[in-house]
Amino acid sequence: AILHLDAHMDLRIAYEGFTYSHASIMYNALQLPQITKIVQVGIRDFCEQEVEVAQSDRVVVFTDRDLKHEAFEGITWKQQCDTIIAALPQKVVISFDIDGMYPWYAPNTGTPVPGGFSFEEATYLLSKLADSGKEIIGFDLVEVAPGENDDWDGNVGARMLFHMCGVLAKNNKLHVGETIVFHK
């Protein structure tokens, strides 16, 4: 399965004439028999065609709006993460599009959209996945685009990549560091 953190569904059959584009990557992934499920988290921008594809029993969508509204009603991020992780089968690839985060974390990405994850929410979900007993078999981090006059996007992307490497190591029982606890 793919755990897909993104602002966009990326389920278009084609985008601007391109069958294999950033807007159709998850549609193309669904064409592979090895991909049994895509669990999308943080989605907040999509078209009608993508909604039709997402209604497949192989796609589970947790929109940013629904997650935020549940939080307003008292559902904790931990509870939401548990539900997201429960929707995944045993073997998981993480696909993280940086525009899944709040736009101020990656203002130079190609298609920023209001809303999204905080850095802490994203890293918490990934850490919970590492501890879940599911097997993380790979990951990617995409659409990180440092700006012309600053490296903020690159800084955030590098920190997320560092965390994702730690999540993969932890999931594979490699002891690469311990969490520092300042308060008991």
Positions of PLM-derived features:
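Catalytic cores of soluble, metal-dependent hydrolases
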Residues: 32, 46-51, 55, 60-184
